[in-house]
């Protein structure tokens, strides 16, 4: 049940990030809002890694290179441009495992829309 809640929390972080970008918000604002929600939910020591080795982003653009700019991180004070694609991937990492989501999105004139599954199948798959 604890892992299910962690997944639900990361899906809420994902929805927050997508919501900011959907409205044309800055990538840095998406980071601030997503990180703040994760901290509010108690994940400050496990968001995107474990202290002291946490990554400081929640998503990155995708294109000809695997990781392109802009990034959902501090300092990227610009929106994802129309036609831009981004992998949004909030996760928590613990000593006994990790859980989160990762989907690719495109921003068009109507906002953000998923290119990959984004909930088309059950989020939790146990192996």
State each model region's role.
Residues 1-127:
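Active-site neighborhoods and metal-handling regions in enzymes and metal-associated proteins
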